[in-house]
């Protein structure tokens, strides 16, 4: 399934940016408390609503990071299932919609190392923030990710 991911945070950043959905302005929400950086470009998919009340989160595999507020045409290939202090907070995994990534069609095509890196980041990036926690519950394949995305689109429309 093709989607447009609006990147909020580039790979390698410890700055947690948030885009105001009404104004389009990019705000620095916080500098991560843990000495960790985002493992991939991270953002959201417009016109969706996750279980946490925000647009669906997505990470994008790219050859080079982009800037905050850049829209990346991507394909959803899997999902990291997790909850945090606010409830369900799944992270869709996508790849740039580009022939260089035709070999990545499903989560099984992604290296175990990259999946472990993503999981480690999200399970631990809030460790030093009081009152916050993350519980990871593993990876879902493309079909599960697409169902979660479809559900988030329906939630947005309701």
Swiss-Prot record:
Its EC number is 3.6.1.1. Its cofactor is Mg(2+). Coiled coil: none annotated. It comes from the Bacteria. The keyword Cytoplasm applies. Keywords: Cytoplasm, Hydrolase, Magnesium, Metal-binding. The keyword Metal-binding applies. The active site is at residue 89. One of its GO terms (biological process) is phosphate-containing compound metabolic process. It is found in: Cytoplasm. Mg(2+) 2 binds at residues 8, 57. Substrate binds at residues 16, 30, 42, 125. Catalyzes the hydrolysis of inorganic pyrophosphate (PPi) forming two phosphate ions. Homohexamer. This is Inorganic pyrophosphatase. It comes from Corynebacterium efficiens (strain DSM 44549 / YS-314 / AJ 12310 / JCM 11189 / NBRC 100395). The gene is ppa.
């Amino acid at each position: 399934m093709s989607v447009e991911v609006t990147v909020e945070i580039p790979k390698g950043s410890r700055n947690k940016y948030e885009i105001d959905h009404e104004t389009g302005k990019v705000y620095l929400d916080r500098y991560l408390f843990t000495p960790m950086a985002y493992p991939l470009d991270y953002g959201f998919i417009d016109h969706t609503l996750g279980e946490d009340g925000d647009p669906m989160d997505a990470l994008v595999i790219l050859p080079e990071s982009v800037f905050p507020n850049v829209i990346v045409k991507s394909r959803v290939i899997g999902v990291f299932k997790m909850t945090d202090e606010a409830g369900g907070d799944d992270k869709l995994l996508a790849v740039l919609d580009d022939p260089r990534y035709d070999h990545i069609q499903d989560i099984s095509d992604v290296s175990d190392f990259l999946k472990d890196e993503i999981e480690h980041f999200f399970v631990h990036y809030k460790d030093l923030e009081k009152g916050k926690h993350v519980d990871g519950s593993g990876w879902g394949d493309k079909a599960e990710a697409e169902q979660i995305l479809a559900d988030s689109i329906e939630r947005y429309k309701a």
